[in-house]
Design a protein with these regions (language model features):
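Hydrophobic alpha/beta core scaffold segments
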Residues: 2-397
Length: 397
């Protein structure tokens, strides 16, 4: 990985296309060194990391920058990590993409509230122009690119930003996740240009000579019970009433719950979804408020109808998804995963951590538990979303 003196010592013939790393040390000096050691064999063009909020973030920034030198580094805080060992908490994980098989452009977006389609057009156009000058793929570059977003998970601006980017990207797929803060819901941050930022987003455009597939799935099945959103707090992702009754009380009623039982775990095990066309999209609840309103992780409008959902088997469904991805791509060298915090709550509740970790290890996943997932122009909840990257095309550089 990293400084040029080390990079030039790596033989291109044997340098891997990708590398993965993780550390459970909360000492930023130790953690950064362990990340560096695991990624050093990859002649990296970029490094992406996800970390818990227990780290002293300023010191972690300095340590990572010291090891990475002029390599592009982006990242964010998380609500749980998927490391080379599997599901973890209070840790850091990372992956590196090699300059032999990847070319990347990164950008920090700070003006989330005013970010427009014009801004997105200018940003994407400039990034594509730069990538064309150093493409690693054959043929039209747009057919060998994907976009990746990391967004402040408390900004309430994900929909605006990803919709603008998606329109500008046209046929280039876009995937990403909303940063977490270990479920404190106080301060989520993204990392770019050597430091952490709040109220911001990071966008990375990736050109690759490797096969890849962008995906997004959920494992939930509909039940009969419905809730109509009858009153909201505009622009706040807060539902005040279902069926003209206090939202929390109606939610409890259809799920057979008591008000005092409501928690993140309960919300994870009793999700709701909105139907758009033939598809059901989950609308996850973040928390119950003192006035009996409910705060959601996604935008939600008055008049929509929500359906009660139940798990159809998280482990079995994830295994099916990963097996199908592997059948289409062959061996997966890296799976960049954005795994909703409510999936993690279900994993913990049902004691699935080791079995899910085994699945993630077998498919070379690096990722984090998010406050929301993005796929193309959609901001989602309760999904397993990401990019599966296969082996390089041997006929290409």
């Amino acid at each position: 990985m990293l400084s040029h003196s080390i990079q030039h010592a790596v033989n291109d013939t044997f340098a891997p296309a990708v590398a993965r790393a993780g550390s459970e040390s909360l000492d930023p000096v130790v953690a950064a060194k362990e990340i560096y050691t695991s990624l050093a064999e990859c002649e990296a063009t970029c490094v992406v990391f996800y970390c818990c909020t227990r780290y002293p973030l300023e010191q972690l920034s300095k340590e990572l920058s010291r090891y990475c030198g002029d390599i592009k580094v982006i990242g964010c805080t998380s609500a749980g990590e998927i490391t080379p060992l599997g599901c973890r908490k209070h840790s850091i994980c990372a992956f590196a993409l090699s300059k032999q098989h990847f070319s990347v452009e990164t950008a920090l977006i700070e003006n989330l509230a005013t970010f427009s389609e014009t801004d997105a057009d200018e940003l994407v156009s400039g990034m594509l122009e730069n990538l064309r000058k150093r493409t690693v793929s054959a043929g039209p570059i747009e057919q060998h690119c994907f976009g990746l977003t990391l967004l402040d998970g408390l900004s309430i601006r994900e929909e605006l930003v990803i919709n603008a980017l998606n329109l500008s990207l046209q046929d280039i797929p876009l995937v990403g996740g909303s940063a977490g803060d270990d479920q404190h819901f106080v301060d989520t941050q993204v990392f770019c240009n050597g430091r952490f930022y709040s109220h911001a987003a990071v966008f990375m455009l990736v050109n690759t000579s490797c096969q890849f597939e962008v995906f997004s799935y959920h494992h939930l099945a509909p039940e009969e019970e419905k809730l109509v959103v009858t009153q909201t707090a505009p622009g706040q992702r807060v539902v005040e009433e279902f069926n003209a009754e206090p939202a929390a009380l109606e939610y409890c009623r259809i799920n057979g719950l008591k008000l005092e039982e409501l928690s993140s775990e309960v919300f994870a095990m009793n999700p709701l979804a909105v139907q758009i066309g033939d598809q059901l999209y989950i609308r996850s609840i973040q928390q119950v408020n003192d006035d009996l309103s409910l705060t959601f992780f996604c935008a939600i409008d008055a008049g929509i109808v929500l359906t009660r959902m139940q798990s159809s088997g998280l482990h079995a469904h994830t295994a099916m998804v990963l097996n199908e991805l592997q059948q289409r791509l062959g061996n997966i060298d890296l799976l960049i995963g954005f795994d909703c915090i409510h999936r993690r709550a279900e994993i913990d509740k049902l004691d699935l951590c080791e079995s899910m970790s085994s699945l993630y290890r077998d498919h070379h996943m690096i990722g984090f538990n998010t406050y929301g997932e993005q796929i193309n122009g959609l901001h989602l909840n309760h999904t397993f979303t990401g990019v599966a990257i296969g082996a390089p095309h041997r006929s290409q550089p």
